[in-house]
């Protein structure tokens, strides 16, 4: 049976399929973890420890050395994405109620959901798209996108926008596994190779545990809103990313639109933030569902939109070249 190949046909499948299975487990048998106990309970409820190991391995996979082109491109995209998320957070905090919207079509929408959906790029999706439509340097720009993984950037955005306050040691605790992994991976290439293999392997495990925090009835209630959130992520982050790629990154905008997705890891952010700041706990389930839907939507639409953009840009460039030759 080609289970893995079938799952990978779904955009973000290795994240989303286990997430859905976990949500099924939580919806129809919410006490399964406590009933079985031991290792089974650990797999069902171990979101934070599994993610801690994943962040460590993610840090170990990043090479310190990179070309100037790669750093300029990736730095431009990462800073722009985070800046846009900060602006959205600052505006949303003045419009959306403190505990999120509780009634009506926008029920479940919160500043936490907006920031979590917008401040991370799906690095793997970006790299695969740019390998097809861009240069090797542009594809390699995902190197700094790993820095967005985890709750740190969301914490910084929420903190600096005045939405939440975090003690300094909480910031350190959030980034320490990543930094230790980063240090070890760059001190010893063999350790980098060893730990980086676990990055993809751990995704289904933390996705399943994360799914066990989601009630499918919440997803049913926020489905259409989640789709609209995914579209909003592409529009709100995509336009500034295209402009930044052209003006600063030295590209034609293709990398910008390729970076306008939501990362699968962003699905875990609401739960992790709620663990640190209990005030966010009531919002976390709906925010998780919204972000999960946004991840699916952006995973489907971003490759299509990038393909259309790339074809138009290349056709325009070819036309200009022909006109120049004629003259």
UniProtKB/Swiss-Prot annotation:
GO molecular function, one term: 2-keto-3-deoxygluconate:proton symporter activity
Database matches in HAMAP family: KdgT
One CC-aspect GO term: membrane
Induction line: Repressed by the HTH-type transcriptional regulator KdgR. Induced in the presence of KDG.
UniProt xrefs under Pfam families: KdgT (PF03812)
Residue ranges crossing the lipid bilayer per the database entry: 10-30, 42-62, 73-93, 95-115, 139-159, 163-183, 199-219, 224-244, 254-274, 289-309
Record keywords: Cell inner membrane, Cell membrane, Membrane, Sugar transport, Symport, Transmembrane, Transmembrane helix, Transport
Keyword Membrane tagged: yes
One Gene Ontology term from the biological process aspect of the record: gluconate transmembrane transport
Name by which UniProt lists this protein: 2-keto-3-deoxygluconate permease
Function: Catalyzes the proton-dependent uptake of 2-keto-3-deoxygluconate (KDG) into the cell. Expression of this specific KDG-uptake system may allow growth with KDG as the sole carbon source. Can also transport D-glucuronate.
Predominant location category: membrane
Membrane topology: Multi-pass membrane protein
Means of activity regulation: Uptake is completely abolished by carbonyl cyanide p-trifluoromethoxyphenylhydrazone (FCCP) or nigericin.
Catalytic activity reported: 2-dehydro-3-deoxy-D-gluconate(in) + H(+)(in) = 2-dehydro-3-deoxy-D-gluconate(out) + H(+)(out)
Periplasmic side: 31-41, 94, 160-162, 220-223, 275-288
NCBIfam families, sorted: kdgT
Protein family: Belongs to the KdgT transporter family.
């Amino acid at each position: 049976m080609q289970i893995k190949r079938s799952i990978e046909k779904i955009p973000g499948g290795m994240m989303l399929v286990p997430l859905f299975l976990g949500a099924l487990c939580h919806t129809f048998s919410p006490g399964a973890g406590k009933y079985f106990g031991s290792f089974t309970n650990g797999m069902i409820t171990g979101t934070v420890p599994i993610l801690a190991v994943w962040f460590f391995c993610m840090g170990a996979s990043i090479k310190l050395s990179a070309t100037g082109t790669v750093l300029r491109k990736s730095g431009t995209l990462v800073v722009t994405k985070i800046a846009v998320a900060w602006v959205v957070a600052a505006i949303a905090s003045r419009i959306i109620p403190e505990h999120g919207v509780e009634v009506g079509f926008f029920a479940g929408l919160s500043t936490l959901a907006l920031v979590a959906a917008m401040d991370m790029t799906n690095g793997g999706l970006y790299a695969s798209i740019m390998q097809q439509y861009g240069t090797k340097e542009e594809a390699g720009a995902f190197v700094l996108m790993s820095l967005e993984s985890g709750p740190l950037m969301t914490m910084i955005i929420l903190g600096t926008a005045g939405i939440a306050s975090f003690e300094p040691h909480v910031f350190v605790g959030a980034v320490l596994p990543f930094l230790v992994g980063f240090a070890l991976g760059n001190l010893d290439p063999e350790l980098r190779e060893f730990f980086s293999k676990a990055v993809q392997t751990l995704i289904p495990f933390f996705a399943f545990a994360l799914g066990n925090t989601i009630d499918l009835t919440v997803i049913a209630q926020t489905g259409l809103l989640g789709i609209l959130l995914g579209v909003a992520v592409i529009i709100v982050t995509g336009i500034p990313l295209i402009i930044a790629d052209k003006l600063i990154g030295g590209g034609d905008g293709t990398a910008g639109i390729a970076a306008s997705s939501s990362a699968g890891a962003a699905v875990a952010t609401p739960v992790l933030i709620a663990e640190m700041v209990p005030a966010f706990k009531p919002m976390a389930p709906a925010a998780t569902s919204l972000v999960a839907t946004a991840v699916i939507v952006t995973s489907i639409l971003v490759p299509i939109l990038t393909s259309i953009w790339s074809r138009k840009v290349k056709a325009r460039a070819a036309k200009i070249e022909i006109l120049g030759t004629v003259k």
